[in-house]
């Protein structure tokens, strides 16, 4: 399966990050799409237990991101992700060293029992162990090579999908042990998730009720980039690597333990752009006949504040500034990201036998909210939105229509109206 027209919008990143991704893409054939989504996971991990995006007093979104890295065997899914997440792995190792040192210095069992094991990344894990980790840490990233291992018969996480969905929404979860009276309650659980699966295993991933439960709909899907460079093995430019390492070091200072969650509001301009997009999204969903795509567009709405706070934090750290609000710039970049991920989801739907069934069965879905609409419907929708007062910038970002194309269409309509 190919995805020739949809590459990750790397323009959302500061130059220090995009240069690093490009350096390893050109010199060692790592995948820029996989690396870019992994960077989103990295940042969300560092801020997940400390910040939330505040749309309004009643609507707050935690920066919890679930990423599915999709490709074929040999596409460098895990190496590309691992290259970006290495700073988290290094931090994880240092946290374990500190824990072990404190444990060894403890003088009795009671003192040892009170020592909390700090972790920021976990791999294959049982549900009970996950609860313990979340109890000790404000945010954890579950990083697995193969997402399907989470749903194997021997993995108890597969039997706790409802609890995982609660974690995604940062709702309280608890664990009652049958062996004793101990009860653990996690009030603000934060669990990021990143892992891969092969295209040929798509139907296994979305099967067994995981699509119907909404579990699959919480994922952002990343497909392999179609950009190809000459195959070479070459050490990366040391300056580019050092600059990126320094930037990550600044990001690492954002992650804190034992702090209250800070709610970061969208400013007036950001909220206006977000509401414009929501209205456009609703009108596009009304045009759809594909139930799965309609539901995904509904779920993706909550991802815009989540992605926006990630973008805002990266921008603030890059400018050596403190995050206080979520800007219009961040929301527009988040809209760019959701357009990318929505297009990937549609691409996957087209390859699913479970969803599409008979090859002759036609279903109407969309790519980045508009691609599958007929030209006539597309033009009518653009005109309707513009007449309702939506800005050209918002329409362009939300519908994936180039600004030049949008301007040409509206200019043509004005000329025709004047005749």
List each language-model region with its residue ranges.
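Phosphate-handling catalytic cores of nucleic-acid transaction enzymes
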Residues: 1-376, 380-383, 388-398, 402-407, ...
